[in-house]
C-alpha cells in the first residue's frame, strides 16, 4: 500500500458565524467540528495528518494535540495557498494525499476510504469527491464530457446557464497524487476577482497536462455539509444527532423520542436502557444496562452502573453504582461517588461525597465534602455544613447511622458506627460509636402565655 497523508483545512476565521470562537472549534454533539474530521481520518491508516491553522491556531492545536501535526497559514489567501503551507511536510513524498475541510463534521471514514480506493483504481492524479443535490446554487459544478470523464470544475458565478443546470457538485474533498499536487500548487495563479489561490485550479492544471482526473460520486449530500453560519451548524448538529441516536437504537437502547434526545458522540449506553425525551447525555458519560433516565435529566461526564433509575435529575462528573434510585430533582455535583443500592431522593444535593452501599438520602438534604458509610438513613432537611466562609471541611458518618430530620453536622466532625443523631440537633463535636448525639435547647412551655400575644384577632 502506498503512503497516505491528509491535509485538513482549518485556518478560516468564519466571520459568518459572528462568534468569538473560531469556526472549526464550534461543537457538534460534544466535539469541535475539526476534531470530528481528524478523528475520522485517523481510522484510515494515514501516515501523517497535517492541519492548516490560522485564526485561533493555539486553541485548535490544543484540541487536536497528539492527533495531528500543524502548519500555520499566516495570511488566508485561498485554499490552494493553504494546502501549499504543508510543502515542507509533504512535498516530494510518494503516496496519496487527502484534502478535507475542517468545517465538514459529517464526513465519514468509510466515504474517504471509498474515495481512496476509487482514486487507486482509476490510476488518477486527482480524484474529486462529488455528490448530486437538488439545489446546487453556490457550489462548483463538475463538468464531464460525453464519456463521463471529468473536464473541469466551474464555480457557480462563472458557470454558463447550461452549466448551472448541472446538479453534480464539488464537495471540497479531494484525493491527490502527493507529488503531482505540490508540483501543480506551484503553478496556481491568483488572477481572479478575489485575488486568491483556489484549489480547484489544480484540477485544471493537471487536465492541461493530460493527467487522469476522476470524480467519485457519493450518495449522501449530508456528509459534505460545510458549516459557515449558525443555521448550518444547527443542521449539522441535527444530522449528527440522528446518526448517533440511530446507532444507539441499533445497539439495543430505547429512545422514546429520538428527535428530542440529545446524546454526545462519545457517550456509551448499555442494552435495554430506556432514555425518555428531553434527556441530555454529555461528554464521555457511560450508562450501563437496564437503566431508565426520565425526561429533563442531564448527565455529564459521569459513569452510571446497571439498573439505575434517574428521575429528572442532574449528574455531573460523578460515579453511580448499580441498583441506585436518583431523584426526582436531585443534583449530583462533581466527585460524588454513589455506591450500590443507594437511594438519592428529591431535592438532594451531593458534592465531593461518598455515599456507602444501601444508604438512603430520601429528600431535602445537602451532603458536601462528606463520607457516608453503609446502611445510613439521613432525615429530611439534614445538612453537612462544610464551609465556614473561608475553608471547606469534611464530615464523616460511619455505618448503620441514623441522622434525624433537620440535623446540622458542623464539619469537621465524625459520627461513629451505629450512632443516632436526634432530630433538630446541631452537632459540633464527634459522636462515638453506638452513642446518641443530641444538641438542642430544652423545650420550655410558658403556660397561658399565648393569650397575651396579639394574633390580630
UniProtKB/Swiss-Prot annotation:
Mg(2+) binds at residues 103, 228. The keyword Coiled coil does not apply. Acetyl-CoA binds at residues 386-387, 423, 440. Binds 1 Mg(2+) ion per subunit. Keywords: Acyltransferase, Cell shape, Cell wall biogenesis/degradation, Cytoplasm, Magnesium, Metal-binding, Multifunctional enzyme, Nucleotidyltransferase, Peptidoglycan synthesis, Repeat, Transferase. Its EC number is 2.7.7.23, 2.3.1.157. UDP-N-acetyl-alpha-D-glucosamine binds at residues 9-12, 23, 73, 78-79, 140, 155, 170, 228, 333, 351, 366, 377. GO terms for molecular function: glucosamine-1-phosphate N-acetyltransferase activity; magnesium ion binding; UDP-N-acetylglucosamine diphosphorylase activity. It is an enzyme of class 2 (transferase). InterPro entries: Bifunctional_GlmU, GlmU-like, GlmU_C_LbH, Hexapep, Hexapep_transf_CS, NTP_transferase_dom, Nucleotide-diphossugar_trans, Trimer_LpxA-like_sf. It catalyses: alpha-D-glucosamine 1-phosphate + acetyl-CoA = N-acetyl-alpha-D-glucosamine 1-phosphate + CoA + H(+); N-acetyl-alpha-D-glucosamine 1-phosphate + UTP + H(+) = UDP-N-acetyl-alpha-D-glucosamine + diphosphate. Its cofactor is Mg(2+). GO terms for cellular component: cytoplasm; membrane. Residues 231-251 are annotated as: Linker. The active site is at 363 (proton acceptor). Gene3D superfamilies: Hexapeptide repeat proteins (2.160.10.10), Spore Coat Polysaccharide Biosynthesis Protein SpsA, Chain A (3.90.550.10). It holds the Pfam family NTP_transferase. It is found in: Cytoplasm. NCBIfam families: glmU, PRK14354.1. In the N-terminal section; belongs to the N-acetylglucosamine-1-phosphate uridyltransferase family. Homotrimer. This is Bifunctional protein GlmU. It comes from Listeria monocytogenes serotype 4b (strain F2365). The lineage of its organism: Bacteria, Bacillati, Bacillota, Bacilli, Bacillales. The gene is glmU.
Amino acid at each position: 500500500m502506498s503512503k497516505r497523508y491528509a491535509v485538513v483545512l482549518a485556518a478560516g476565521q468564519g466571520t459568518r458565524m459572528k462568534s468569538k470562537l473560531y469556526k472549526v472549534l464550534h461543537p457538534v454533539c460534544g466535539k469541535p467540528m475539526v476534531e470530528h474530521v481528524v478523528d475520522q481520518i485517523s481510522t484510515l491508516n494515514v501516515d501523517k495528518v497535517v492541519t492548516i491553522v490560522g485564526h485561533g491556531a493555539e486553541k485548535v492545536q490544543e484540541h487536536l494535540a497528539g492527533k495531528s501535526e500543524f502548519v500555520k497559514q499566516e495570511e488566508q489567501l485561498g485554499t490552494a495557498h493553504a494546502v501549499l503551507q504543508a510543502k515542507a511536510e509533504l512535498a516530494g513524498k510518494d503516496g496519496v494525499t487527502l484534502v478535507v475541510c475542517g468545517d465538514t463534521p459529517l464526513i465519514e471514514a468509510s466515504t474517504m476510504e471509498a474515495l481512496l480506493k476509487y482514486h487507486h483504481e482509476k490510476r488518477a492524479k486527482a480524484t474529486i469527491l462529488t455528490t448530486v443535490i437538488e439545489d446546487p446554487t453556490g457550489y462548483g459544478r463538475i463538468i464531464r464530457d460525453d464519456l463521463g470523464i471529468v473536464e473541469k470544475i466551474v464555480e457557480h458565478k462563472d458557470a454558463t446557464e447550461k452549466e448551472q443546470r448541472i446538479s453534480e457538485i464539488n464537495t471540497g474533498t479531494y484525493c491527490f497524487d502527493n507529488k503531482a499536487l505540490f508540483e501543480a500548487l506551484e503553478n496556481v495563479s491568483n488572477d481572479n476577482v478575489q485575488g486568491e489561490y483556489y484549489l480547484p485550479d489544480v484540477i485544471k492544471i493537471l487536465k492541461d497536462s493530460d493527467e487522469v482526473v476522476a470524480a467519485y460520486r457519493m450518495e449522501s449530500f449530508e456528509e459534505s455539509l460545510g458549516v459557515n453560519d449558525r443555521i448550518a451548524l444547527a443542521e449539522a448538529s441535527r444530522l449528527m444527532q440522528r446518526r448517533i441516536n440511530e446507532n444507539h437504537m441499533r445497539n439495543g437502547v430505547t429512545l422514546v423520542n429520538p428527535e428530542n434526545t440529545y446524546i454526545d458522540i462519545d457517550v456509551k449506553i448499555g442494552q435495554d436502557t430506556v432514555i425518555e425525551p428531553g434527556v441530555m447525555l454529555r461528554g464521555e458519560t457511560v450508562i450501563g444496562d437496564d437503566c431508565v433516565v426520565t425526561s429533563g435529566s442531564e448527565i455529564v461526564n459521569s459513569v452510571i452502573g446497571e439498573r439505575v433509575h434517574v428521575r429528572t435529575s442532574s449528574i455531573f462528573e460523578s460515579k453511580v453504582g448499580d441498583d441506585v434510585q436518583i431523584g426526582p430533582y436531585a443534583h449530583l455535583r462533581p466527585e460524588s461517588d454513589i455506591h450500590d443500592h443507594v437511594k438519592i431522593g428529591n431535592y438532594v444535593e451531593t458534592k465531593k461525597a461518598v455515599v456507602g452501599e444501601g444508604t438512603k438520602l430520601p429528600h431535602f438534604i445537602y451532603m458536601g465534602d462528606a463520607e457516608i458509610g453503609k446502611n445510613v438513613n439521613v432525615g429530611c432537611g439534614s445538612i453537612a455544613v462544610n464551609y465556614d466562609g473561608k475553608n471547606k471541611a469534611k464530615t464523616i458518618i460511619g455505618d448503620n447511622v441514623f441522622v434525624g430530620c433537620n440535623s446540622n453536622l458542623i464539619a469537621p466532625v465524625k459520627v461513629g458506627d451505629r450512632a443516632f443523631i436526634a432530630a433538630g440537633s446541631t452537632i459540633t463535636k464527634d459522636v462515638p460509636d453506638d452513642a446518641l448525639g443530641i444538641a438542642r435547647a430544652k423545650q420550655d412551655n410558658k403556660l397561658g402565655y399565648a393569650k397575651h400575644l396579639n394574633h390580630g384577632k
